[in-house]
């Protein structure tokens, strides 16, 4: 198996750009560097774990994913000061980076893939890099502790395979933010061309099912909104904020779900 990938593809895979076209534009503009060397050809094959930087990049995190967690932190009472966290589906580490910048003291960065976590996070002693690790096999004993906070951003797997494990890793006083991705939750017949779900009724069905499933896992809804950025294929995604406390939890109603979906489609 090759350990190299086209530069434009790698930049998208790392969440630095939402499309190959935008990645290519940045490459042609001379904005992409591997270590201190500028790379100006989109087709250049580079190591999948290369240290890539974007000159003039205004993104505050190692990937766009950090903006998703940032929104949740801004609108919900999430205090990560000195928190121990699990980042499920860490990938490049956007959520991990955001959490660290907001005070987290330790992050278990878990992903079934490998050679994806950003170089700066690999070097950060606060980050425990758990690559090649299927979350469904992770136990509290493996971590050595229960955690204060969990973030979930997974692909090609439903949250109904992840939430039951996540709740076993979380303290009773902890909280969890999950990215709900309709393209991986809806049946294949409801996913459109290019893997995009545009039907708001499908969005509502997915949210209803996942929120009820979380409730059955004793993860109670305390906030629901839409992601501030779309997925790489242009999919609308949603953010659920949960705790293990049923006190002041939101009721999972059609009105709540419809309002959030309508707002997401209005953008």
Residue ranges of model-derived segments:
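Glycine-rich SAM-binding Motif I of class I
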Residues: 93-94, 115
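A basic, amphipathic helix-loop patch mediating RNA/tRNA/ribosome contacts
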Residues: 1-50, 84-85
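S-adenosyl-L-methionine
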Residues: 108-161
């Amino acid at each position: 198996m090759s350990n190299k990938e086209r530069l434009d593809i790698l930049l998208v895979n790392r969440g630095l750009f939402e499309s190959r076209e935008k990645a290519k534009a940045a490459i042609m503009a001379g904005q992409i560097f591997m270590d201190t060397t500028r790379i100006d050809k989109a087709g250049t094959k580079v190591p999948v774990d290369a240290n890539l930087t974007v000159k003039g990049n205004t993104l505050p995190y190692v990937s766009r994913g950090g903006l998703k967690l940032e929104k949740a932190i801004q609108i919900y009472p999430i205090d990560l000061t000195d928190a121990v966290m699990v980042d499920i589906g860490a990938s490049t580490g956007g959520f991990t980076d955001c959490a660290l910048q907001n005070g987290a003291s330790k992050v278990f960065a878990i992903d079934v893939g490998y050679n994806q976590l950003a170089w700066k996070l690999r070097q950060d002693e606060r980050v425990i890099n758990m690559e090649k690790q299927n979350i469904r096999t992770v136990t509290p004993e493996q971590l050595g502790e229960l955690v204060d906070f969990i973030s979930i951003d997974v692909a090609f797997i439903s949250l109904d395979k992840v939430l039951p494990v996540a709740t076993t890793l979380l303290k009773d006083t902890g909280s969890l933010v999950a990215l709900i991705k309709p393209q991986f939750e809806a049946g294949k017949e409801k996913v459109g061309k290019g893997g995009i779900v545009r039907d708001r009724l499908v969005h509502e069905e997915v949210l209803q099912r996942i929120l009820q499933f979380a409730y059955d896992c004793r993860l109670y809804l305390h906030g629901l909104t839409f992601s501030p950025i779309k997925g790489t294929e242009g999919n609308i995604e949603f953010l659920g904020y949960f705790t293990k406390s049923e006190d002041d939890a939101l009721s999972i109603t059609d009105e709540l779900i419809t309002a959030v979906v309508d707002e997401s489609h209005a953008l």
